[in-house]
Amino acid sequence: MNDLPSPVDPELAERRRARELRRAQRRRQVFIRRLIALAILGVIAIAIAGGIALSSGGSSPESATKQPSPTTPAKPTEPTKLKPEAILGAINPKVAGITTFRGNLTRTYYGHGPVPRHPAVKWRYPTSGGMCAQSADEHGVSTWCGTGWTGQPNVIPHKNGLLELRFGAYDDNYHFLNGRTGKPIKPELVTGDLAKGSATSDPDGYPLYYAGSRDNNFRVIAMDRASPTTLWSMNSETTVPYGHWNNDWDGAALVVGDYLLEGGENSWFYVVKLNRGYAGGRVTVNPEIVLTVPSWDDQLAADFSTDAFSIENSVSYRKGRVYFANSAGLVQGWDIRDILRGGSNYRRTFRFWTGDDTDASVVIDDKGFLYVASELEKYDERSTQVGQLMKLNPFRKKNPIVWSLPVRQTGSEGSGGLWSTPALDRGMLYVSTNAGGLLGVDRKTGKLRWKIPLPGPTWASPVVVDNVLIEGDCTGVLHAYDVSREGVRPPQLWSLKVDSGCIESTPAVWRNWIWVGTRGGAMFGISERARPKRAARAKNA
């Protein structure tokens, strides 16, 4: 790996200067908005005794607040006594399916084998053309196609044998397909902008789907109607005092009990009481936003001097504590046990700064250690000090780093580091790099055991099922490696040209099937290729 970044060409430098100018303008706007918001809050605090309930922990940022629900749907008209629809979820280990990104609360479940050993593309959706739409970002309006970095599908087995595939795409829609045929089984759910794809199906059997869009709205969707139906939504602009950076919803939510946990690109973490039930034979919800927590604090604003605090990863959870990171590199842990019991107390239990944009989800192992992957764009002192891949002990506040590894080799836009979420497998950790390639790292020591170069950027998060490691590259090729021997550079089992578009999305693996979308515009179903029939033996004359 290179110790220094590659030279930056003048055009790229000019784009960076323009981006920094836009960020500075946004910072000035946000500063003015914050002053106005603080003035309003001050008036309210004087007028209303008690004010807003604050966190019980002294380390909690002062702007963390309990929030009311933005809308109040009607309550169920009858008690919840009906048996939920037979949709199986993987967060619950007693049932089957991949219901959220990386399948469980700690983001460590990758699917169910067997993995195809002689794979072939069985179907493409759509059969021609692509799932494309126009959308605007800081670079202007452009056409987006297919599924991107956050686009792992849900896999939902039904009791009648149907295998359902659910995913969002850059055509602004959520799609619901027969996983074996690629044919739609329900109409699309149309949103007002990109549907990034990291959505969640209810893990407790309720026919509900939780999905965000770049149109500002995070939706709770009923799946027991003829068409997917939005029962409730929360708007990233109107549900918090003020936001930072963006209004998208990149992360896949978690459902813990009757509570939904989600982070937004508006830089806030949410806890929503769902109040799930049934009325008239149909699923109902009566959601209430019970907690919002900012992803930043004053120390981060001083250290990072930017308003880029968005949460672009999927939150993780273990034993009452939720973990997430933001695009300024702040990793936080919050104790929300009392909130999940209907109380009002919560506190920050962990704070760690990586020094740079951290979009990958925090992964938690069985001992409670955290594995964090960070990008390398700023090349500042902090990111040099702590590296881009690290194992953290969240119960050790003064020096939580167990080990760290620099990943400085540069790729797209002159950036190094990691966009993908690491995969844990026995004593190893696997992660793909922005420069292009796979790393195999010893979980205990942090020692780099091997690396495999691939055409980058490789943003898809690796998956490991039945000792097979699967990763996509940016030429549209899917690779499978035999990782049965820990610590040894794995031999490639197969590679499959899926499409010409970059594979940014994480594959979903389930019982001899692999599904993956590409930036070329389509979703693909992959399974064992048909074996040729043996030719009849020639008869002796």
Question: Model-predicted segments: where are they?
Answer:
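Terminal targeting segments of Actinobacterial cell-envelope proteins
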Residues: 1-32
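Intrinsically disordered, low-complexity Ser/Thr/Pro-rich tracts
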Residues: 2-3, 8-12, 61-70, 112-114, ...
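Short, flexible coil/linker elements and helix-boundary hinge sites characteristic
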Residues: 5, 9-10, 56-57, 140, ...
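Low-complexity, Ser/Thr/Pro/Gly-rich disordered linker/stalk regions
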Residues: 31-34, 38, 64
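Core hydrophobic alpha-helical transmembrane segments of single-pass membrane proteins
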Residues: 38-49
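C-terminal region of N-terminal signal peptides and the immediate post-cleavage residues
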Residues: 47-69
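Extracytoplasmic/lumenal domain signature
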Residues: 70-96, 101, 108-149, 154-250, ...
